[in-house]
Every structure is written in C-alpha cells, then in structure tokens.
C-alpha cells in the first residue's frame, strides 16, 4: 500500500510512534526506494548506496517522534538523507576523489584499439547500457558533495526550488542560481566529451572493453541490468513540482529508478521483526 498524502503519512507516523510495528514497517517500505535512489546518485555505486540507505532509514525511524509536522514528512526525510549523504565519508569516491579534468583526460588518453574483447560472451549492447548507467552516477562524483546534492534534487528528483531550498537550508533564489551554474558545468562536459549526447569522442559501446580492463565494469556483476526498476509514477509522490530544463545536463533526468536491493529489504524485515518498538520510538 502506497502512502500518497501528508495526511496519510501523519496517520501512519502517529501509529508508529504509539508502538504499531505494522505502521513502522509501512513507513520504511514507502521510503526505502526513494532513499536508495538518492544515495545511489550521491555516492555512485550500489554497495555504497545500500549501506548509506540503511543508515538513513535507521535515523528516520529512530527519530520519528521528533517529527513535528512543520514541513511535509518527505521533505523532513530528504533533509535527514541529504545531510547524511553530503557528509558521508565511507564511500569509494571519498577515498578516490574525481574531477572533470581527470575524467576528460581519461577519455582523451584511453587507447581503446589496444584492448582485446573482454565481454565474456555477454551481449555488448547490455554491457554498454550498464556502462552508460554507471557513468552517469560516477560522473556526478566530479562535483563537490553539496553541488552534487543540488544537481540531484533539481535534475533527477525534479524538486521545486522552494522545497529543495528548504531541504538544503538556502533560499529558493540561491538554490536556483547554484543549480543553473552546476547544470551548465555538467552540460559543458557532456558537450565536449560525451558522444551519446554531445559531439565528444566517448561512446559507451566502444568503451566497454576498456571499462572492463580498468575494473569499472564487470560482466559477471551487472548491478543496473539486474536491478528491478520502479515506474516514474511510484516516485512521483516525492516530487512537489516539476521544473523545465533546457540544457544538456537534462540528459541525466533519463536515469532509471530502482527498487532498493533485496539485502536492504531483508535487513529491515529482520530489524522490524526483532527490535523493541520502545527502543525505536523513544530513541
């Protein structure tokens, strides 16, 4: 059962805080996909996104009693999630930071013709699509964490500037200005280097073997290909408004959304089955 309105959220929250385990489970089920997808965009890999999503959802359910209804519940959750993700230091790219300069040099200097066929009998088109999905999230790691968050909220989640500004504690005007600058930066890079959307030399199909050789793509472990997609309609309950986007950075809006992995779902099934509700609601 999907929770679609603030009134419904309030009803389930009141029940959960009062000790209703079913209500708490309903809240987690309705949040976990949104939290996982936000984590994936911010951190760039499925394993890191899984770990962060678990941390965020635990923060949410252990602080439910502090929600005062001064904003929409989903806005409150986004605020917790973005604050956690902006300061998250345990993910891969926190240890190996990227830049647009590094990414561009890698594209320019890769000797694709010298790499043998490494596809391991997996269709090249499938691997190219996997690489495309992975690249869109990894490319975002070239932005600093706050800029990445601004871009993700505005371009992928399409949040209204008033809501996004509230989440990030900035005015709508300041948010729009920063989002515009960040979009232009991403669009300029895509235009210069990406052959899928711009005039650049990088094409996913041609880069598959190089990506496998450099351990950026594993034919035996295709996270995006094997993930279960969810429909845009299922994510729409988290969006308060839509914004028009008119540059190449809008291409990131095509990114698919996914169900949180089964490991995360199982973690919370076991947690909710074993945890004392008093420990949760009184934390």
List the model feature ranges, each with a label.
Residues 37, 51-58, 71-83:
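Structural recognition of an alpha-helix C-terminal capping motif at a helix-to-coil junction
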Residues 32, 36, 57, 85, ...:
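C-terminal flanking helix
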Residues 17-18, 42-45, 57-72, 91-93:
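Sigma70-family region 2
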Residues 1-7, 97-149, 159-172, 181-283:
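Intrinsic, short, N-terminal disordered tails of RNA polymerase sigma-factor systems
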Residues 2-3, 17-26, 36-55, 172:
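Short, charged helix-capping/linker segments at alpha-helix termini
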Residues 49, 175, 179-182:
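Helix-turn-helix DNA-binding helix
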Residues 28-47, 63, 89, 142:
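Amphipathic, Lys/Arg- and hydrophobic-enriched alpha-helical face
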Residues 65-69, 82-100, 188:
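Arg/Lys-rich amphipathic alpha helix in sigma70-family domain 2
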């Amino acid at each position: 059962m999907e929770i679609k309105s603030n009134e419904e959220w309030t009803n389930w929250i009141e029940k959960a805080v009062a000790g209703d385990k079913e209500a708490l489970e309903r809240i987690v089920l309705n949040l976990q996909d949104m939290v996982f997808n936000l984590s994936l965009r911010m951190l760039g890999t499925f394993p890191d996104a899984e770990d962060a999503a678990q941390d965020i959802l635990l923060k949410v359910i252990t602080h439910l009693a502090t929600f005062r209804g001064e904003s929409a519940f989903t806005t409150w959750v986004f605020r917790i999630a973005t604050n956690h993700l902006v300061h998250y230091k345990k993910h891969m790219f926190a240890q190996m930071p990227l830049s647009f300069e590094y990414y561009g040099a890698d594209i320019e200097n890769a000797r694709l013709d010298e790499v043998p066929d490494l596809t391991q009998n997996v269709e090249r088109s499938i691997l190219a699509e996997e690489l495309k999905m992975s690249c869109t999230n990894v490319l975002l790691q070239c932005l600093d964490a706050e800029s990445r968050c601004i871009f993700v909220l505005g371009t992928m989640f399409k949040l209204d500037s008033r809501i996004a500004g509230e989440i990030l504690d900035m005015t709508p005007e300041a948010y729009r200005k920063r989002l515009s600058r960040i979009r232009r930066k991403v669009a300029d890079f895509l235009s210069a280097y990406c052959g899928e959307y711009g005039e650049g030399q990088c094409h996913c199909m041609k880069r598959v073997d190089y990506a496998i050789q450099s351990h950026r793509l594993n034919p035996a472990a295709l996270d995006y290909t094997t993930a279960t997609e969810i429909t845009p309609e299922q994510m729409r309950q988290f969006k308060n408004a839509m914004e028009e986007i008119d540059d190449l950075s809008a291409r990131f809006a095509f990114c698919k959304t996914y169900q949180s992995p089964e490991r995360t779902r199982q973690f919370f099934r076991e947690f909710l089955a074993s945890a004392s509700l008093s420990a949760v609601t009184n934390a």
